Amino acid sequence: MLSDYEEFLRLEKARKIILEILNEKGRDALYDLSGLSGGFLIDEKDKALLNTYIGSSYFAEKVNEYGLKHLGGDENDKCVGFNRTSSAILATILALKPKKVIHYLPELPGHPSIERSCKIVNAKYFESDKVGEILNKIDKDTLVIITGSTMDLKVIELENFKKVINTAKNKEAIVFVDDASGARVRLLFNQPPALKLGADLVVTSTDKLMEGPRGGLLAGKKELVDKIYIEGTKFGLEAQPPLLAGIYRALKNFNLERIRKAFERAKNFDLSKIEKLNKELKAIDDNINIVYERTPTGFVIKRVYKDDTINIKKLIEIGFNLLKNYGIITITVAGMPGASKSLRIDLTSRDAERIDDNYIIKAIVESIKMAFKS
């Protein structure tokens, strides 16, 4: 694990390199393959409505309308904007003040914002990717959090999803689904929206696998959403008009077809050169071990070295090689503190459409070689 200060230095370094490339070569020399490339699709007529109170009134109504459609809500539900998904998670835990939070996800670890929020209200926190462990710990004093898709886009099994929700409902526990990427990627597996599965609350990120600004969209039962939103306003966690405008336009323009195309491209992406490189490097150092897997919209390199500390340092070094030499932006180097250090390549962005598979795989292979042969 990196310290907070080391995380800060990593982020500062990444931003400096991005700015240098932008100034020297222009925007076309950068390829955001993080899966969080986002966008800001507002219309010209939206600009006149960005005033604090006019914008809040107009765009909040639009976000509610299109957000409920996106997240599967009905007339008993409400949808509001926050300035990040993490902000919505914090506001939820501050408002509900649960005695304990039980978190089920497809693969450990969970997003750090959840445990950090629990510490603020002194809630006991437990996370597991074993459904049996989760079911045994749920009671009426529990806030049950379910992650639909991990930071590395591993998708929850639908039957386990339903089991946790049904058990929570039977024990009168509130169910909150962290569907940051899952609200969209789960659609590729024909999974229903979280609210249609019986969740009380769901949050999604408006920059993940869609062309919105970095923001959080919270939807669910009106009385719960109102309570959480009010708590969020006390700390300035709610989305302001410019952000709401970007979220509204992203929702209105959302098209699953781009994600479907990335899904098909990912299935056919040739990863054999990574396997070949792994064998070559292991002959030099038996501690080198490139662990990779396909994701629904690309692939992820989860490990390159057996020792955990060295592994994280090497993944970051590889990420910086990708950025400096090939203009490829990943969460590994540009992500917020606490984000996964796995090297994830996501093919859903417009930038991904500008480069072919050969460019990406060459960049990956050469960047790994550089990290281990320097």
UniProtKB/Swiss-Prot annotation:
Needed co-factor(s): pyridoxal 5'-phosphate
Q: Which domain of life is it from?
A: Archaea
User: Which SUPFAM superfamilies does the entry link to?
Assistant: PLP-dependent transferases
Gene3D superfamilies the record matches: 3.90.1150.70, Type I PLP-dependent aspartate aminotransferase-like (Major domain)
Task: Provide an example Pfam family for this protein.
Answer: SelA
| Keywords tagged on the record | Pyridoxal phosphate
Q: Which GO terms describe its molecular function?
A: L-seryl-tRNA(Sec) selenium transferase activity
N6-(pyridoxal phosphate)lysine is found on 208
Q: Does the keyword Lipid biosynthesis apply?
A: no
Q: Check the record and name the PANTHER family matching this protein.
A: L-SERYL-TRNA(SEC) SELENIUM TRANSFERASE (PTHR32328:SF0)
According to its UniProt record, which protein family does this protein belong to?
Answer: Belongs to the UPF0425 family.
Q: Relate the assembly described in the record.
A: Homodimer.
Q: What is this protein called?
A: UPF0425 pyridoxal phosphate-dependent protein MJ0158
